[in-house]
């Protein structure tokens, strides 16, 4: 199965018409993964026996015409729990964790009759921007195996970009869907906070985390979002907002005509690579040619986003990860003398360096005497950043800009420099702080590596982002470019 030459709708039509069976498609998917993943290293766990049984059952029942995802394989980031299928969060702490329940999104995909083929690699507990922080392996960029795939959803991004699957789920706390999507030349959406249930997502930063789809095209992404979105009684932060058929509206390649688009001057400031700037300016020209107005706007407090995020996110992480103590959950150390020994040794052995760094930062920020100076101040900065977005989006349909300051960097180049790594998320983090939807899509190339564009919208207005993304896609060909797997540029 050549996933580079099809899309979800075409594949579903072939399944309904019995040009291919769900079992044949699933088997071909596993064959392809086994051929390519020795180089890409996108997957941590495969679900072959259960997936083939599910595919056979779908074939026996007949692929439903009103289920646009029925019979189609999907990959899940390995911090989304799957009943009976190992879920590790790429951490030694959870190396042998077999969940006894499904995440809500896992259930929703099963109800849509998608077939989960496996779990993808990530930075440990989703903390990182390169997937190098995984305890188990380093995933490669599909376009160049010497480059990182981004993170923390690098495994899902690489799986889609390398043609192993047509669709995958990731999670985004500070850019972890959008940045790897940009680095791999695919489409990734961080939905509005609350659009998708977090029940069954192994928590990092509970006020920031969102699960979202990663696909090869905007329309496929929209189809996936409709399947996983909606209120969930298990997640009280999930919204009761109605979930439209996002893909149904994607028919007009000129749908941005008359729209006002904001392009923040801060998004093209020093530190953003020239090729990235040129790609975004060219995209702005494309929108102008389609009848939109593109205005220079300002998000003056954007520069404080990274600092605020690493205080808030790390504080929430230090609280969420308390449960992994060697007694209730997670790895338990051997040769311990007392209760304190259990805690110290289990956590020291189970967590990697980046997770430890963030736990310590978060614990410090929440400690007596420092709470007001750090956490409370970061929360106030968050409000200011939200107000900046609100002011711009009051007069503009959406905001556009780059996803990351540079294309994918080399494996090993930044892993020993946490501050440099953190600054790669300077353009995505503010969107999480504000709880807004952000769509990443291919917008160009720099020395053979993909450059991503980010569209940022009003709360629960993913529809406008999809329309704008679709219009751009239909008037360019960046999303049609595919990697010569691992070819160095």
From Swiss-Prot:
How this chain assembles, per its entry, is: Heterotrimer of A, B and C subunits.
Of the GO CC terms on this record, one is:
glutamyl-tRNA(Gln) amidotransferase complex
Protein name, please? Glutamyl-tRNA(Gln) amidotransferase subunit A
Key words, A-Z? ATP-binding, Ligase, Nucleotide-binding, Protein biosynthesis
| Family, as annotated | Belongs to the amidase family. GatA subfamily.
Q: Which NCBIfam families match?
A: gatA (TIGR00132)
Kindly give the HAMAP family that the UniProt entry links to this protein: GatA
Spell out the catalytic residues. Answer: 77, 152, 176
- The EC number(s) this enzyme carries: 6.3.5.7
Catalytic activity reported: L-glutamyl-tRNA(Gln) + L-glutamine + ATP + H2O = L-glutaminyl-tRNA(Gln) + L-glutamate + ADP + phosphate + H(+)
Record has ATP-binding as a keyword: yes
Taxonomically, what lineage is the organism? Bacteria, Bacillati, Bacillota, Bacilli, Lactobacillales
The organism encoding this protein is: Levilactobacillus brevis (strain ATCC 367 / BCRC 12310 / CIP 105137 / JCM 1170 / LMG 11437 / NCIMB 947 / NCTC 947)
**What's this chain's function?**
Allows the formation of correctly charged Gln-tRNA(Gln) through the transamidation of misacylated Glu-tRNA(Gln) in organisms which lack glutaminyl-tRNA synthetase. The reaction takes place in the presence of glutamine and ATP through an activated gamma-phospho-Glu-tRNA(Gln).
Can you cite a GO biological process for this protein? translation
């Amino acid at each position: 199965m050549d996933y580079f030459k099809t899309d979800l709708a075409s594949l579903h039509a072939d399944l309904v018409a019995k040009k291919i069976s769900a079992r044949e498609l699933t088997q071909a998917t596993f064959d392809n993964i086994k051929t390519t993943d020795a180089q890409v290293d996108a997957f941590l766990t495969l679900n072959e026996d259960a997936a083939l049984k599910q595919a056979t059952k779908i074939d026996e029942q007949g692929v439903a015409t009103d289920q646009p995802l029925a019979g189609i394989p999907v990959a899940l980031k390995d911090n989304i729990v799957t009943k009976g299928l190992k879920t590790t969060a790429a951490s030694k702490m959870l190396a042998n964790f077999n969940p006894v329940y499904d995440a809500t999104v896992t259930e929703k995909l099963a109800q849509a009759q998608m077939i989960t083929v496996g779990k993808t690699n990530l930075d440990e507990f989703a903390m990182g921007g390169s997937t190098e922080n995984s305890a188990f392996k380093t995933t490669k960029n599909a376009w160049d195996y010497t480059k990182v795939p981004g993170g923390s959803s690098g495994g899902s991004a690489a799986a889609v970009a390398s043609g192993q699957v047509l669709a995958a789920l990731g999670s985004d706390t500070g850019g972890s869907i959008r940045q790897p999507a940009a680095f791999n030349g695919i489409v990734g959406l961080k939905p509005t906070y609350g659009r998708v249930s977090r029940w069954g997502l192994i928590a990092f930063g509970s006020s920031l985390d969102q699960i979202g789809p990663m696909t090869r095209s905007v329309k496929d992404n929209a189809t996936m979002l409709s399947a996983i979105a909606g209120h969930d009684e298990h997640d009280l932060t999930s919204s009761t907002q109605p979930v439209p058929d996002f893909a149904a509206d994607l028919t007009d390649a000129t749908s941005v005509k008359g729209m006002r688009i904001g392009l923040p001057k801060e998004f093209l400031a020093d530190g953003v690579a020239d090729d990235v700037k040129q790609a975004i300016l060219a995209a702005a020209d494309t929108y102008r040619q389609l009848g939109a107005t593109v205005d220079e706007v300002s998000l003056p407090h954007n520069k404080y986003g990274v600092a605020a995020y690493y205080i808030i996110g790390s504080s929430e992480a230090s609280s969420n990860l308390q449960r992994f103590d060697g007694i209730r959950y997670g790895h338990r150390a051997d040769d311990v003398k007392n209760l304190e020994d259990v805690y110290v040794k289990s956590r020291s052995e189970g967590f990697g360096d980046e997770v430890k760094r963030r736990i310590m930062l978060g614990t410090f920020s929440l400690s007596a005497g420092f709470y007001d100076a750090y956490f409370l101040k970061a929360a106030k900065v968050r409000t200011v950043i939200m107000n900046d977005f609100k002011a711009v989006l009051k007069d503009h349909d959406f905001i556009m800009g780059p996803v990351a300051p540079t294309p994918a960097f080399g494996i090993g180049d930044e892993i020993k420099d946490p501050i440099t790594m953190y600054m790669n998320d300077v353009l995505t983090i503010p969107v999480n702080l504000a709880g807004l939807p952000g769509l990443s899509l291919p917008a160009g190339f720099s020395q053979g590596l993909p450059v991503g564009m980010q569209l940022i919208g009003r709360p629960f207005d993913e529809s406008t982002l999809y329309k704008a993304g679709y219009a751009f896609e239909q008037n360019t060909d960046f999303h049609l470019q595919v990697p010569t797997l691992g070819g160095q540029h």
